[in-house]
């Protein structure tokens, strides 16, 4: 009598994630699920969304497969299905950490939070480097044995500084750049070259209080909720597709400085979730919006 494979043995298979968007029509899920079945894959989790406004369909499938299945073989064999449905698709190993670069200026709470979460395995990322236009956090970053890169930025050398960043991204095979309170405005050209690959944390509940000193703007309006917004960076300042938002209730007696203090926590929470979801390939762009399979 042969023993049946245990669940523990099944989970030892290689893990993959397929994400796609395409014009909505009948047969998409059938085509994908049939393909996975015919290639010997097992669906672990599947989420989908059809947007009636844009006419687009979005799908994320987490599946497993035993060797000799490989990611390269899967990509090659899935291409025909992708073409037939005019899909924008990606297929990746789910168990490989995404390589990221963190960028920071003078406020270190988001940087510190991301470094700690990554160090304990709470974020599925590998931090390739931390880049800053100041040297304040070089020692902190060094304590995690992560390379620290000081790239000063002035009006005169901005193009050169961004060229250094792009070179680092390419050399280190970086998939995501995280602006963890990096206070320099990126050029239109850089935003286009890294479109969909830069996440920023803005310290307000967008679309309210854009630009500088949003907590002071919020205080002047007497808000009862303050928030933070993690979004993709575009050439339009603080206008990129929103990924995640977090809020905290405040009373009428709080000062602008107290709002800043409360805001640090919500900034960290919103940014950490956005980075985690991006690294797990749970976010799909839908025009100026996002679809988040959280």
What are the language-model segments listed below?
Residues 142, 146-172:
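Adenosine-nucleotide cofactor-binding segment
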Residues 100-110:
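Short, glycine-rich nucleotide/cofactor-binding loops
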Residues 118-126:
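A short alpha->loop->secondary-structure connector
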Residues 1-98:
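A conserved regulatory-domain signal marking ACT and ACT-like small-molecule sensing domains
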Residues 109-119:
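Histidine-anchored nucleotide/phosphate-binding helix
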Residues 134, 157, 161, 172-294:
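Donor/substrate-binding cores of folate-linked one-carbon enzymes
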Residues 21, 101-103, 131:
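Short hydrophobic segments within beta-strands
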Residues 125-136:
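Short internal beta-strands
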